[in-house]
Amino acid sequence: MALFSKKDKYIRITPNNSLKSSVSRNIPEVPDELFAKCPACKHMIYQKDLGPAKICPTCSYNFRISAQERLTLTVDEGSFQELFTDIETKDPLRFPGYQAKLQKARQATGLHEAVLTGTALVKGQRLALAIMDSHFIMASMGTVVGEKITRLFELAINERLPVIIFTASGGARMQEGIMSLMQMAKVSAAVKRHSNAGLFYLTILTDPTTGGVTASFAMEGDMIIAEPQSLVGFAGRRVIETTVRENLPDDFQKAEFLKEHGFVDAIVKRTDLRDRIAHLVAFHGGVS
């Protein structure tokens, strides 16, 4: 008989000797949405400290917000009248999974499409308004987005209204192929007709504004303003660096970089946008 018995390599668990936690199972759970991590300064922030404008109290980073949140921050209470809600995509390519993706985005955002369009008052100034929402398939521009914005410009021409667009997009919607790319030219033509009518068009670039939206109506405003630190560009940074074979500046494609190089007229804090919009619309002969 051996002096020392060999210990088992593993602990055997049976119904009679199952491990029991010494910690109470009634552990309070912290809700997932109680805190938010700032993408810029990496601090964990209590959601209530962000305020309605969703601005980081540590570094002033502007969190991405929904179209409904931006609407609340911008227009006079109860003045918004939504338009063009009956437009549906025909899904021309019968792209696999596209309809399911649309339905999921609608349930998640409460929007029918990636842009909210209508008329509203901002400090008593009546205007045509479009707000793109990056939470809806990254606010990609498909046929419905292009059609809604085009119709908004046509309405603005008929009613002699200024147009204000909050842009945010990942680019053209690949699930709709060439039909998506055609929206760039269609909306740009509507912008030109609105301009020929002597009406004011203001674009507000928000994070992120990229791809076909940047290459068309986002940069065609009579005035172009941007939120601080917004990503604005056409192609991605890595694509450009690979093409030109150069390292780009750290702030490349940021709103501040664009302003420095003359592509943006002004950078305005989110909390100041409502006042700035009202001032610019009134200055350009606004409608009350």
Swiss-Prot record:
The enzyme's E.C. designation: 2.1.3.15
ZnF segments: C4-type: 38-59
Necessary cofactors: Zn(2+)
Pathway membership: Lipid metabolism; malonyl-CoA biosynthesis; malonyl-CoA from acetyl-CoA: step 1/1
Annotated transmembrane regions: none
Origin: domain of life: Bacteria
Major enzyme class: transferase
GO cellular component terms, semicolon-separated: acetyl-CoA carboxylase complex
Enzymatic reactions: N(6)-carboxybiotinyl-L-lysyl-[protein] + acetyl-CoA = N(6)-biotinyl-L-lysyl-[protein] + malonyl-CoA
Name of the protein in question: Acetyl-coenzyme A carboxylase carboxyl transferase subunit beta
Naturally occurring in which organism (per UniProt): Streptococcus equi subsp. zooepidemicus (strain MGCS10565)
Upper taxonomic lineage: Bacteria, Bacillati, Bacillota, Bacilli, Lactobacillales
